UniProtKB/Swiss-Prot annotation:
Stated family: Belongs to the NAPRTase family.
Phosphohistidine carried by residues: 220
Name of the encoding gene: pncB
Job of this protein: Catalyzes the synthesis of beta-nicotinate D-ribonucleotide from nicotinate and 5-phospho-D-ribose 1-phosphate at the expense of ATP.
Modification(s) after translation: Transiently phosphorylated on a His residue during the reaction cycle. Phosphorylation strongly increases the affinity for substrates and increases the rate of nicotinate D-ribonucleotide production. Dephosphorylation regenerates the low-affinity form of the enzyme, leading to product release.
Reactions catalysed according to its record: nicotinate + 5-phospho-alpha-D-ribose 1-diphosphate + ATP + H2O = nicotinate beta-D-ribonucleotide + ADP + phosphate + diphosphate
Protein's name in the database: Nicotinate phosphoribosyltransferase
Enzyme class: ligase
UniProt keyword annotations, A-Z: Ligase, Phosphoprotein, Pyridine nucleotide biosynthesis
Amino acid sequence: MTQFASPVLHSLLDTDAYKLHMQQAVFHHYYDVHVAAEFRCRGDDLLGIYADAIREQVQAMQHLRLQDDEYQWLSALPFFKADYLNWLREFRFNPEQVTVSNDNGKLDIRLSGPWREVILWEVPLLAVISEMVHRYRSPQADVAQALDTLESKLADFSALTAGLDMSRFHLMDFGTRRRFSREVQETIVKRLQQESWFVGTSNYDLARRLSLTPMGTQAHEWFQAHQQISPDLANSQRAALAAWLEEYPDQLGIALTDCITMDAFLRDFGVEFASRYQGLRHDSGDPVEWGEKAIAHYEKLGIDPQSKTLVFSDNLDLRKAVELYRHFSSRVQLSFGIGTRLTCDIPQVKPLNIVIKLVECNGKPVAKLSDSPGKTICHDKAFVRALRKAFDLPHIKKAS
């Protein structure tokens, strides 16, 4: 499998913005915390045959480093501090933190090491897996097909939104981790730049090179790790929210709500948090039900929902985004993050439903109990029970 051994990645910044945002917070607050994370394919794809090719790419990643022009660009952003950027300048991926194997046809990947280092593996490694698999499976697919598909979808989008006030519609590219290829993502983003409602990308490399706004705050792992960092499990979500505000008191203020279900999140999201955070991000469960709960929560706290932003990012496409926009646009500010349906939308190409999620922090289990049962991840059933009890959650959902 060495015919495709040329490196997929060419920049340390070819990752999602929230990875660097979280890494800085970990660097400042949890420098000595260790974690473990594991790969999951949520579909029925047997990806183990690609293990050797992926292992080669993991080895190649150790040569990535922050370039001088990238360092200068990050330095000009308002939320990065000099001590972190100077450390990042010396950062190199350590392939010894990653084990890749073929487990009876299934791709098995485990990451372990200091959280401040391991945190950067997830997004570029998923992008590598996606691109390597598609190179083998769909060698005939190309950028032109992706662009043709997008043009067709944009024509449908224009017809769908004719006569609709789109001044409050904001779309972001969230497509790095499951893209068909780096080239396809860049081509799609360049085309979307022509649309007035396109506001940015989660990819720091593309944001820098295309003069776009980088988008993203924090991910599930921020909340998961606090399940073991916090001395009180029931307080762990509030501890995560508070620690984020310590690092970013006036910016990057969109909170992810579904690490332990939306209902449990809202019980922790009191008036101080709700006032200080700019808004909330949806990533599982029914989006309309979620949005209604969020708006009702703000109103109950005496906060005008119009002053807050709801970000929808779960399995979206342009049509779903318009439906949500029609439903909510008069009541709250909105943004939509679309990933796979932008960057891996090519005829006869099956996108991968793949993730890498935290499973341990300081040698102890952590869990994600989202609003979609199929997204629940944890090895330790006793810990899942303890987590459900601590957060007063109802009926049991199967952990996977």
